[in-house]
Amino acid sequence: MSKCRFDEVSLFPEAFNNFFNHGLIKKSFEERIASIHIHNPRDHAIDNYRKVDDEPYGGGAGMVLKPEPYFSVFDQIPKLNKKRILLMTPQGRKISQSDFCRWSTQDQLILICGSYEGFDERIRSFADEEISIGDFVLTGGEIPAITVINGVVRLLPGTLGSAESLEEESHNEFLLEHPQYTRPSEFKGMKAVSYTHLTLPTILRV
C-alpha cells in the first residue's frame, strides 16, 4: 500500500497525464510511495448527454457545475481514516509550504477541481478546506491540484534522495536560500562565490 493516496475529481483527467511521467513524481508513483486515482464527474452524469453543468439560478454569465455528478463521484471514492478533502477554488485560502507539510502526514488527499463559472454551493459541503494557489483565476482547478500533489509527494519519505534536501531547502524555515553555484568555478569571467562561511554583522550574531 502506498504512503499517500491521491484522488483527483476532474472533468479533464488528461491534464494530469504528462505530469506523472517524469522526474521524482514518476519515481514516487512507480515505487508506490504515492498512488493516484482520477475520477471524472462526467462519467456520473444522470442524463444521456453526460451534462455536468447548468445555468445559474437567477441568471448571470457562465455555467455552474451540477451537484449530482460530484456527489455520486464522492460517494464512490474509498475513504481512508486519515484524510483531507480539498476544494480547488479562487475564493479559497492561499496555500503555503506549511500546508504541504501538514498534508504529507495524511493517508489520503481528495482534490476536487472546479471549472466553468464555479461549483453549485452544495458541492462545498463535503470539503474540509477550500484552497487557492494565488490571487488570480484559472480555467480550472487542475493546475492547483497538480501543485498540491507536487508539493506533498516530494515530502513523502523515499521521494528525495537525501533527507538533507528537505531539511535545508528554501522554505522550511520560511527563508530564501543564498545564491547557488557549481563547477566550473569561473565561467565567462563570472566567479562562483562560496557561502560556506559567512561573516554576519555583529547585530545579527546570536
Regions found by a protein language model. Name each.
Residues 1-77:
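N-terminal nucleotide/polyanion-binding subdomain common to many enzyme families
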Residues 7-9, 37-39, 86, 109-110, ...:
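Hydrophobic/aromatic beta-strand patches that form the interior of the parallel beta-sheet core
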Residues 23-27, 101-105, 128:
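Short, solvent-exposed amphipathic alpha-helical segments in soluble enzyme
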Residues 41-44, 115-119:
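Short glycine-enriched loops at secondary-structure junctions
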Residues 155-191:
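Internal, active-site/partner-interface "lid" segment
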Residues 196-199, 204:
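Conserved small/polar residues in nucleotide/adenosyl-binding loops
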